[in-house]
Amino acid sequence: MIYKTLDKNDYLKYHNTLIGKDFKFSKVAIGMWDFMKAWEDWPPRVLELNGNILSVCFMKISGQAKSKVLFISNIFTPASGRGKGSAREMLHRNILEAVEAGATSIRLDCNKSALGFYDKLGMTYWGTTISHSMFCDLPINDKGVECFKQTTNMSSLEILNSYPQELRNAKIKWIMKKVKKHKEFDFEHPSRYNEFMKCFFDDKNTITT
């Protein structure tokens, strides 16, 4: 599979070849690129095989130096790419690109319709957001999607303490902002919210400062 970017004109040409739900999903993605004015700075990433596009993704790297974060949204796999591991490979390539650019973590809101995909990767969640998606903010490295298997067995405390102090404090504030007031429980996809809060109130579990 070839991992590359498309400019706006090429993506719109591709978009116009789609039908049904694929067309509708792609149209939403186009609206996001337009709204964020991201066509030049963060053009669509695509996976291509034999001239056929198997997966499309919006990604953005934000922050400076050691605080760079990979944002992922709208991993879109059209009918022609389903059942081929395209979405997994797309996310893997996104992470490798981001790590090479200096990113140390990934942040995304996981829609519940896509949780089966993220669960298989070993992803864990800090809690439920106001939009009822599961919030993920985890460290990444040059192992790509395999890095999630490493964090699966780590406690929330271990994950937070794996970051440099200045980044750790920002992570804590962001997690609190995203999930503090939304304690909805999903027993099939449990979150780290209670364990995360315990880090602040249990003398045995102290976040390193």
Model-derived regions: residue spans:
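Conserved beta-strand in the GNAT
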Residues: 46, 52-62, 69-76
